[in-house]
């Protein structure tokens, strides 16, 4: 499996894949998660992720920056990022508008947001960092 502790070439490749909307796998110590940058996410890829999620017991969530979370009035428990639970049913428009400030007027009432407190947030922090390095909105869907 690919780990974020690998060499610089692997990291550069993962950042490039995120830029093109290709999911990547990050992890360490036997815990791995699929990371999808929200900005290039399209409806087709989202539907495939939903199918995968429905066939497993995984709980996907969104990682966003502290600044975005504060604007959305979501609680921040992990330093400089917030991990948000997805609503049921999961909506493509909700995910995109939560991540993208340019859609705040199109989809004004998205809350309430429920932040994750438990679990390790290290992979989420790396995912946000990779999105920033890819020059994307710092928001990721994590499965």
Each PLM stretch: what is its role?
Residues 1-143:
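Catalytic domains of riboflavin
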């Amino acid at each position: 499996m690919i780990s974020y502790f690998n060499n610089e070439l692997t990291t550069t490749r993962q950042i490039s894949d995120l830029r093109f909307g290709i999911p990547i796998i990050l992890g360490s110590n036997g815990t791995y998660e699929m990371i999808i940058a929200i900005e290039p996410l399209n409806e087709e890829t989202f539907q495939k992720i939903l199918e995968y999620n429905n066939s497993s017991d995984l709980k996907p969530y969104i990682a966003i920056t502290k600044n975005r979370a504060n604007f959305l009035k979501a609680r921040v428990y992990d330093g400089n990022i917030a991990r948000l639970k997805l609503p049921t049913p999961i909506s493509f428009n909700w995910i995109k508008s939560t991540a993208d400030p340019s859609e705040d007027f199109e989809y004004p009432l998205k809350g309430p947001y429920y932040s994750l407190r438990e679990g390790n947030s290290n992979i989420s922090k790396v995912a946000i960092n990779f999105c920033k390095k890819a020059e994307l909105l710092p928001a990721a869907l994590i499965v």
